Amino acid sequence: MSLLRRWFDPIRSSWFYQKPVRQEVLPTDQGLTIYLRLDDVYSYLAAQQLPQLEEILTDEMKPLKVVISNQTASPPNEMSALEWQQYCLNDAKILSKQHRFSFHETPEQPNAEALQQAETILRHTPLRGQDFLYLMEDVFHMLWQKQYGKLRTLHAMASRHHQVQNFPERVFNQTPVLSAYFEFADRKYQAVDDLLRLARRLEQQKLLTDNPIFLINHIEWREHLISDAEELNEIQALDPELDLYIALEDPISWLLLAYIKEELADYYNIQLNIYPLSYHGRDQFDWSLATRLSKRSEVKFTPFCRPTAAASLAMAELFYSVPAEQQLEAMYEILRQVWTKGKDPSFKTHFDQLRRDLNIEQLTEQDISLRLQQNDMYCEMKSQPSLPVLELRIAEQSYVFNSLYRVWMIESIFSNVLEELYKSENESENEQRKT
């Protein structure tokens, strides 16, 4: 590891974390823009929030600018187009259930003819502002709820009675859009996952006229969905298991592992299994994002020393040198030393200190690189677009999700499992009464 990184990372990271937060006032001259694709399921979910957002924007932020692209971008994490499409449909279904979006029980990608008809309707309509957003929401409903008859009727009317319109706040182009996102002052916000963060930013700058109410069932950090003792016992008795596939050089791995271990594992009796991955180059991360997540999740962070490939390998060697039943505590301690004490496991002095702290007398003789490659392979089989990857097993069901944006799913799944359990018990009781 670079001596500069070992010396200066802990100093810089501590300063960055502790410096007074002066909320930068972002320029508003470009307004607020949302980028959509008619064949993007996240755009469909976002479209259901836009009329409300437009309604509470201040006059200087109106109108909300809409860019509709017909060009997708390459799927993340080397996923195939089909894998990405299926992932998005499944994920959107989960989001729609959690936040009560309108969504079809068996969603399908709209066909090319329907997409062309939808674009024609939106190009031809003379409606503007909130009226246009309501129309666009209706058009998205027709596309994604398989209401093709309604779409054809509206298309015929639009083609017959209106010409193509040209409004500055409505743009049709080929900007590559992977999934819907907002743009404000050259900053991007994912249209669903970052909507609350965007709303907080707009509220801080007094760019909203009313309190934003989006994603009504959002689960905050350190907030538990289940607090009733009887319900809690039900979940604990099901012995849930959670596999975590983590890149050791990624601070999000530490923040999520620490949060889950400290806040959820004992509370819900979750057995945690850790699968470290080979170096993915995630030490070049967004310091602001990691700092913000640390403060919101109340997980200690900094001073840190960003691990290199060699440091990640050394961390994995320590992890696999302790007995299996001690590996969770070992990984927690290794990551804690790196991300809150500024230790560099590729530096022999720090490595030896970690080894003593973990009571490791003999280092493993396993081929660590090979072991990490095996974990990589298992992780890739989960077909997830980002890290960390999580797999939760409970009540003979398995649920796979990923990243800091989906940690709330752990508690949401538990709540749904309880709901199904009680529903099944009630049905059984009703059947017994009949007999």
Where does each model-flagged region fall?
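Alpha-helical membrane-targeting segments
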Residues: 1-25
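C-terminal cap of thioredoxin/glutaredoxin-like
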Residues: 3-4, 11-12, 28-32, 43-55, ...
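Short hydrophobic/aromatic-rich motifs at helix boundaries and adjacent loops
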Residues: 21-23, 61-66, 169-171, 231-233, ...
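Alpha-helical context
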Residues: 22, 26-30, 68, 72, ...
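Aromatic-flanked redox-active Cys/Sec active sites in thiol-based oxidoreductases
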Residues: 35-40, 245-250
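Structural alpha/beta surface segment adjacent to cysteine/selenocysteine redox centers
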Residues: 38, 42-142, 254-341, 421-422, ...
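Residue-level preference for long, well-ordered alpha-helices that form the structural scaffold
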Residues: 81-84, 88, 160, 249, ...
